[in-house]
UniProtKB/Swiss-Prot annotation:
Residues 102-143 are annotated as: Intermediate domain. It holds the Pfam family Death. The keyword Methyltransferase does not apply. One of its GO terms (cellular component) is plasma membrane. InterPro entries: DEATH-like_dom_sf (IPR011029), Death_dom (IPR000488), MyD88_Death (IPR034249), Myelin_different_resp_MyD88 (IPR017281), TIR_dom (IPR000157), Toll_tir_struct_dom_sf (IPR035897). One of its GO terms (biological process) is MyD88-dependent toll-like receptor signaling pathway. GO terms for molecular function: TIR domain binding; Toll-like receptor binding. It is found in: Cytoplasm. It comes from Danio rerio (Zebrafish). PANTHER family: MYD88 (PTHR15079), MYELOID DIFFERENTIATION PRIMARY RESPONSE PROTEIN MYD88 (PTHR15079:SF3). Keywords: Cytoplasm, Immunity, Inflammatory response, Innate immunity. This is Myeloid differentiation primary response protein MyD88. Residues 24-101 form the Death domain. Residues 147-281 form the TIR domain.
Length: 284
């Protein structure tokens, strides 16, 4: 059945490409090549900066990281990946891996065509398992009226003081917003990854990402950010809002570079900071 499907590469995200394709693509592009373009040329064509590329160089398999970061962008389609490889004059790679690539694309299309199994008594918009019932401080233990929030706050522990200031400015003022702060609102004893995905997707209208140097080293923040981006490719719903509250020594995360940020690190913009952030979180 899969072989009969015609492929529109423009409509298929790069996330559809499986591990075997990624590994083989890396085998072509990772080695430094004095004759053909390597991963650095491809990264430049993907619009990564010089500093980002220098950071990628520190990895054993740099192209895997390049592809992982690029695939969160709104233009990360299979068609654009093929176009970039052509611009890099690596048609040899396309020719060698085209069969594997198309096979992954067909499998993705098959999965998209399958109708999800729906049980009549289950509301797909609400919690679906016991693990997702009674997860926050003011949840209904039976899961009938789950607690909802205006925004999920993605932060690392070293930035908790700024989160306290955010609570003060957005919850205890005329803005009267309701924030989901993991350390304050989530009950202990639950799976961190499952609960975070439930809150971000089902319970919170938006997500605020507190960006700092320490954020870049946080596995939890990395998961939460990429999960939120996967829910709104291209930021069409203004779902994710990056916030910078102090100057950074390390490069701003490339996967968030296409989003408008709220910057508290510059004294000249602080006067507008809370009003802008509150307005963004108050949108329908």
């Amino acid at each position: 059945m899969a072989s009969k499907l015609s492929i529109d590469h423009e409509a298929i995200p790069v996330t559809a490409l499986n591990c075997s394709f990624r590994k083989k693509l890396g085998l072509f592009l990772n080695p430094t090549n004095t004759v053909a373009a390597d991963w650095r040329t491809v990264a430049e064509l993907m619009d990564f900066t010089y500093l980002e590329i220098k950071n990628f160089e520190k990895r054993d398999c740099p192209f895997e990281k390049v592809l992982t970061d690029w695939e969160t962008r709104p233009d990360a389609t299979v068609a654009n990946l093929l176009s970039i490889l052509e611009k890099a004059e690596r048609k040899d790679v396309i020719s060698e891996l085209k069969e594997i690539l198309d096979d992954d694309c067909r499998k993705y299309m098959e999965r998209q065509q399958r109708k999800p199994l729906q049980v009549p008594v289950v509301d797909s918009c609400g919690p679906r398992t016991q693990e997702r019932e009674g997860i926050t401080l003011y949840d209904d233990p039976q899961g009938l009226t789950p607690e909802t929030f205006d925004a999920f706050i993605c932060y690392c522990q070293s930035d908790i003081q700024f989160v306290h200031e955010m609570i003060k400015q957005l919850e205890h003022t005329e803005y009267n917003l309701k924030l989901c702060v993991f350390d304050r609102d989530v009950l202990p004893g639950t799976c961190v990854w499952t609960i975070a995905s439930e809150l971000i997707e089902k319970r919170c209208k938006r997500m605020v990402v507190v960006i700092s140097d320490d954020y870049l080293d946080s596995d939890a923040c990395d998961f939460q950010t990429k999960f939120a981006l996967s829910l709104c490719p291209g930021a069409r719903t203004k779902r994710l809002i990056p916030v910078v509250y102090k100057s950074m020594k390390r490069p701003f995360p490339s996967i968030l570079r296409f989003l408008t940020i709220c910057d508290y690190s510059k004294p000249c913009t602080q006067v507008w900071f809370w009003t802008r952030l509150a307005k963004a979180l108050s949108l329908p």
